[in-house]
Amino acid sequence: MNILLSIAITTGILSGIWGWGAVSLGLLSWAGFLGCTAYFACPQGGFKGLLISACTLLSGMVWALVIIHGSALAPHLEIVSYVLTGIVAFLMCIQAKQLLLSFVPGTFIGACATFAGQGDWRLVLPSLALGLIFGYAMKNSGLWLASRREQHSANTAVTK
């Protein structure tokens, strides 16, 4: 069984579980899938990738709240929102000099989830966090399944 098929199987199973779990817990299922996406897209794998993804998602949420609350200070001057968005977008990219904030797409995913969740960080945060953990489980259980299948095939070939 190849790696892609193994990851597809575990992702399919765990996606169904996540969909049910998110609804049962009153979380945003779509935000959870953004958390999954962040882990899958992060160039680092394993625990390091999980940590980097978590830090960038969280920083994106904070930056989105800066834009939301900063824009609210001058609601009748739309230009303030545009300038603030430009400055924050610059900072979201430049922060990638730091290893734990080096996954720029994760930062933007966290910000977009916060905007889509209308700034309700108390709902967005656990949705993203659990989704991120599910993404970690999806990919790593798929890799485990593929390696187990490969070991089984190798053992079968040796005994023949």
Curated annotation (Swiss-Prot):
Tell me, in one coarse class, where this protein mainly resides. Answer: membrane
Show the GO cellular component annotation of the record: plasma membrane
Keywords, alphabetical: Cell inner membrane, Cell membrane, Membrane, Transmembrane, Transmembrane helix
Could you tell me the membrane topology recorded for this protein? Multi-pass membrane protein
Q: Where are the transmembrane segments?
A: 20-42, 50-70, 72-92, 99-119, 123-143
Q: Where does it localize?
A: Cell inner membrane
Protein family (similarity comment): To E.coli YahC.
According to UniProt, the name of this protein is: Inner membrane protein YcdZ
Organism per entry: Salmonella typhimurium (strain LT2 / SGSC1412 / ATCC 700720)
